[in-house]
């Protein structure tokens, strides 16, 4: 069967060729290897038509140019040589586009990422729209790869090596105005005249490359280059802790191209692409990408969601303010905040103002757009304006009676169809719904702090929650820009349940004499964004530890914290960063110096602060308890799948993405090896390390959680 055409060529009366990109039946344009023959056929036609004056590439999709290459192609490669051949094919096609004797212009609207930007870089000029949907970037590093179709060679020559390195090493996406300022595009125009401007550019001679800033020219020379790569290498190593091989290869490949010429650069790029595609880190990162894409498509239940036209929020504190912001400014829904104090409402409104004003200052948002978004948020100290709200999110104190009272008030003051969603982190949803007249419309909706940054939400139905309530809440979470996982109504839900033993073990090692900074550094080296002690300071020691007694009551002594340690810290009025007193010292605002541990913490908890464990030993103790608890959560159906478990850990607590999540990590070690490590730790440190039955059985049978080590889902 012949493949439907993705690239369509039309020649205008003025002899400008328009190549329209439109992958049939797909929302996004992505590049696949099988499109190569189509592109070559079009290039042949372009070369044969001697009347042509220029060429314009444009997308038929309403919100994307090309979103990148199809990642499934990489998963289908069995060897580094196969993946390298893919890169070489991409490089060759881009070279053929660039070698056309007439001007070739990319007319960009919407996402222009990865292979899409590499195609645009192969063109002689680029014009893009000023639409917020228009972003340009090379995000391959986030999949453990590097740009494989010439991006590592063309970008540094176009915008300068230091700017290009920042883009490629971080996967950073640029808005239109930023891209223009850096010289990545030649013009930024309204969408309505994009094609017209691109055509006019194609009629001129090839756009001459803009001279690079003096700084970039110095850094491109041998001395400047040596200094730059040394500095960037050091900074990158500090950031990645050596856990992401792609960053090292990016530096190596870009430097090769600059020092030895583009031919050597392209060779190095293709070779590195092939080798990186086979690394466990890239396989794990691609698995996270596929899993998160699947989760975002998951409706949560079979029932159709109810309409969502407006939302109410109870409580204007830190969480309430954050939830109001994502509901109004991301989901675009009108929000009404109720707080018993006018100050609470002001706090919540200021929260959104601060977020939006920051965007205005960075020129990511117009002041008029800020005002429009803020106008969606209103406040009240009673239930006026709540009568027709479709969903109410409760974000009040963690007190069961108070939350039950909120349910009663909402049922009394809101419509019969209104859903009550509690942002509790520790109280059973079934208990919150115990006295409800419409328990089927009560559900848990657990956000993580800070709300605007943390991508995960846990959606917690109790036994009586209806399928439609689940579907509607999932729909809201997605509108808010969140990745939702549906979890069972058991103590701690999923994320806090696997996090608690990890934090507890860190505190226990403190009491044994390990130093705060050693414990934190060990877990950062392992791959977490921050260490467990610093995390406790950031979240709030009072907030972070209040769930421990709840978990201990539900699951027994494996959740008990070291005796009196937490109470000693809290009794000394240490709540962490929020009150400037925690495990670390907090000086003046704005100081970026390295965090210092408060030496008073050691006598306070009766410890010496003289460690004996190596960094891997520290990490092993914390992580093994987390893995064991994650397996219990699968066994007890707290999570619906290992996919949700991996996504929940990576997006909810920063489990190292390059390991793919707890279940991928267990598979990579082997369940038998995990059991052996835990049995050794149980002998050394006690029964809390006893591996759970499911893990022991899987180890004995040589089973894994994922059916395959490839990136496809089960």
UniProtKB/Swiss-Prot annotation:
Cell location: Cytoplasm
Listed GO biological process terms: fatty acid beta-oxidation
Signal peptide positions on this chain: none
Site (Important for catalytic activity): 118, 140
UniProt keyword terms in alphabetical order: Cytoplasm, Fatty acid metabolism, Isomerase, Lipid degradation, Lipid metabolism, Lyase, Multifunctional enzyme, NAD, Oxidoreductase
GO molecular function, one term: enoyl-CoA hydratase activity
Coiled coil start-end: none
Domain of life (superkingdom): Bacteria
UniProt region (Enoyl-CoA hydratase), positions on chain: 1-190
Pathway: Lipid metabolism; fatty acid beta-oxidation
3-hydroxyacyl-CoA dehydrogenase: region residues: 306-714
UniProt EC number: 4.2.1.17, 5.1.2.3, 1.1.1.35
Main subcellular location: cytoplasm
Database matches in InterPro entries: 3-OHacyl-CoA_DH_CS (IPR006180), 3-OHacyl-CoA_DH_NAD-bd (IPR006176), 3HC_DH_C (IPR006108), 6-PGluconate_DH-like_C_sf (IPR008927), ClpP/crotonase-like_dom_sf (IPR029045), Enoyl-CoA_hydra/iso (IPR001753), FA_oxidation_alpha_subunit (IPR050136), FadJ (IPR012802)
Keyword Cytoplasm: yes
Gene Ontology cellular-component annotations: cytoplasm
Reaction(s) this enzyme catalyzes, per UniProt: a (3S)-3-hydroxyacyl-CoA = a (2E)-enoyl-CoA + H2O; a 4-saturated-(3S)-3-hydroxyacyl-CoA = a (3E)-enoyl-CoA + H2O; a (3S)-3-hydroxyacyl-CoA + NAD(+) = a 3-oxoacyl-CoA + NADH + H(+); (3S)-3-hydroxybutanoyl-CoA = (3R)-3-hydroxybutanoyl-CoA
Family under the similarity heading: In the N-terminal section; belongs to the enoyl-CoA hydratase/isomerase family. In the central section; belongs to the 3-hydroxyacyl-CoA dehydrogenase family.
Role this protein plays: Catalyzes the formation of a hydroxyacyl-CoA by addition of water on enoyl-CoA. Also exhibits 3-hydroxyacyl-CoA epimerase and 3-hydroxyacyl-CoA dehydrogenase activities.
Cross-referenced PANTHER family: TRIFUNCTIONAL ENZYME SUBUNIT ALPHA, TRIFUNCTIONAL ENZYME SUBUNIT ALPHA, MITOCHONDRIAL
Oligomeric form and interacting partners: Heterotetramer of two alpha chains (FadJ) and two beta chains (FadI).
Name of the protein in its database record: Fatty acid oxidation complex subunit alpha
Organism the protein comes from: Escherichia coli O139:H28 (strain E24377A / ETEC)
């Amino acid at each position: 069967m012949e493949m439907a055409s993705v690239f369509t060529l039309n020649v205008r009366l003025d002899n400008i060729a328009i190549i329209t990109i439109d992958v049939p039946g797909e929302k996004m344009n992505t590049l696949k290897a099988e499109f190569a023959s189509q592109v070559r056929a079009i290039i042949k036609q372009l070369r044969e038509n001697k009347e042509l004056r220029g060429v314009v590439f444009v997308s038929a999709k309403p919100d994307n140019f090309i979103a990148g290459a199809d990642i499934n192609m990489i998963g289908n490669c069995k060897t580094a040589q196969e993946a390298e051949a893919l890169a070489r094919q991409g490089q060759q096609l881009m070279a053929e586009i660039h070698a056309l004797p007439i001007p070739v212009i990319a007319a960009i609207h919407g996402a222009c990422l990865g292979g899409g930007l590499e195609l645009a870089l192969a063109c002689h000029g680029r014009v893009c729209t000023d639409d917020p949907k228009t972003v340009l970037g090379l995000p391959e590093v986030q999949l453990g790869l590097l740009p494989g179709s010439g991006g590592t060679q063309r970008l540094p020559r176009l915008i300068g090596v230091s700017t290009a390195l920042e883009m490629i090493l971080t996967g950073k996406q640029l808005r239109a105005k930023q891209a223009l300022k850096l010289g990545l595009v030649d013009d930024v125009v309204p969408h309505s005249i994009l094609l017209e401007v691109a055509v006019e550019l194609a009629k001129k001679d090839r756009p001459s490359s803009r001279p690079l800033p003096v700084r970039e020219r110095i850094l491109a020379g041998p001395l400047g280059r040596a200094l730059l790569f040394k500095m960037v290498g050091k900074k990158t190593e500090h950031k990645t802790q050596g856990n992401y091989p792609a960053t090292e290869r990016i530096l190596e490949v870009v430097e090769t191209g600059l020092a030895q010429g583009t031919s050597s650069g392209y060779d190095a790029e293709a070779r590195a692409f092939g080798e990186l595609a086979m690394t466990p880190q890239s396989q794990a990162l691609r698995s996270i990408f596929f899993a998160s894409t699947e989760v975002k498509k998951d409706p949560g239940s079979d029932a159709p969601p109810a309409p969502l036209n407006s939302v109410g929020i109870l409580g204007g504190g830190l969480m309430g303010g954050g939830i109001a912001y994502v509901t109004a400014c991301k989901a675009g829904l009108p929000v009404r905040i109720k707080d018993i104090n006018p100050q609470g409402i002001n706090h919540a409104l200021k929260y959104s103002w601060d977020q939006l004003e920051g965007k205005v200052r960075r020129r990511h948002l117009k002041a008029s757009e800020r005002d429009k978004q803020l106008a969606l948020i209103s406040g009240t100290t009673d239930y006026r304006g709540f009568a027709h709200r479709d969903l109410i999110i409760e974000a009040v104190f963690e007190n069961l009676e108070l939350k039950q009272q909120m349910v009663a008030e909402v049922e009394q003051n809101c419509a019969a169809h209104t859903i009550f969603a509690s942002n509790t982190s520790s109280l059973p949803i079934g208990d919150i719904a115990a006295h409800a007249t419409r328990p089927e419309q009560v559900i848990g909706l657990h956000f993580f702090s800070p709300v605007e940054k943390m991508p995960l939400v846990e959606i917690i139905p109790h036994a009586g929650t209806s399928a439609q309530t689940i579907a509607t809440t999932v729909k809201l979470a997605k509108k808010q820009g969140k990745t939702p996982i549906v979890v069972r109504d058991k103590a701690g839900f999923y994320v806090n349940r696997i996090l608690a033993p990890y934090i507890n073990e860190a505190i226990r090692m403190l009491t044994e004499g390990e130093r705060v900074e050693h414990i934190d550094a060990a877990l950062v080296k392992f791959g977490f964004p921050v260490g467990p002690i610093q995390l406790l300071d950031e979240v709030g020691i009072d907030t972070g530890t209040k769930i421990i007694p709840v978990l201990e009551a539900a699951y027994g002594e494996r959740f008990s914290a070291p005796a009196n340690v937490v109470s000693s810290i809290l009794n000394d009025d240490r709540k962490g960063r929020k009150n400037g007193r925690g495990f670390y010292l907090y000086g003046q605002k704005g100081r970026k110096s390295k965090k210092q541990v408060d030496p008073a913490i050691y006598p306070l908890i009766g410890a010496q602060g003289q460690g004996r464990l190596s960094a891997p030993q520290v990490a092993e103790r914390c992580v093994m308890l987390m893995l064991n608890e994650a397996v219990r959560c699968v066994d007890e159906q707290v999570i619906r799948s290992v996919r949700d478990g991996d996504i929940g850990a990576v997006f909810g607590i920063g489990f190292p993405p390059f390991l793919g999540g707890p279940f991928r990590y267990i598979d990579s070690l082997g369940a038998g090896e995990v059991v052996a490590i835990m049995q050794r730790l149980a002998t050394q440190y006690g029964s809390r390390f006893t591996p759970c039955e499911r893990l022991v059985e899987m180890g004995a049978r040589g089973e894994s959680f994922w059916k395959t080590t490839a990136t496809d889902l089960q």
